[in-house]
Amino acid sequence: MNRRKFISGVTSAFLLSISSQLMASDTSETEHKSHDMSKMPENWTKDEQIAMLIYPGFTALDLIGPQYMFAGLMGAKVHIVSETLKPITSDTNITIIPTTTYDKVPDNLSVLFIPGGGESVIKALSNEKLMNFVRKKGSKAKFITSTCTGSLILAGAGLLNGYKATSHWVARDALSAGGAIPIDERVVIDRNRITGAGVTAGIDLGLTVVSLLRDNLYAQTLQLLAEYAPKPPFNAGTPITAPKEAVEIITSMFGNYTKNAQNTVKKALI
């Protein structure tokens, strides 16, 4: 066994252990003998089916933030979906193993979730099998959701036409290529479309979706469990608050991204 496979195996075991503690998939079958559950309302256990798409080069934190919240839905089943069951490597070289494939995802989805990425999103928009999966499941899902540039994939699938939506700030304007109305907000809800802004907004999106599937108290309880009370060391999380030099660096790095994304979204719609 080589070093990479060993690390992958240890990581998978660790994540499996964490997910079981956080009431992840098939939580209705999990006994929490070490926890006193008597204070929890009886109606807090349901049976949602949640599909979270992954593809080569997706942004890991786009997935992990919402997944933590979705995994806390007692009784829900969270599917990590890709074309095959082969491990998928993220933008930061974290390897995630899918739990199911496109053809085995239930039709009665409570949530379809799409993470974003950089150039990987451009490639995903040109992937016919991936886009057909998003179109098919998105046409029936109760909630259609995304974080960061994942909304570009929704736009390319024709699922945001006429809807308000957001994305990472460097790509937000590209949403208009799919008929969406770009909105500068951390989380945007328009009917059953729920989109999050860049990367870390996935945590906020996850809590928002949880509150809609269950109730505000459930979401607040998960927020407390996660101790999600961010106080970043810098106030540079948006182009408005960040130093001019930082904005110029990022804008220069992604100067052609919006145009490329717009063109690719348009092609995906044809």
Q: Where would I find each of the regions flagged by the language model?
A:
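Extended, subdomain-level signal for the structured scaffold at the beginning of enzyme domains
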Residues: 2-144, 152-155, 172-173, 182, ...
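Flexible glycine/proline-enriched surface loops and loop-helix/loop-strand junctions
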Residues: 117, 188-192, 203
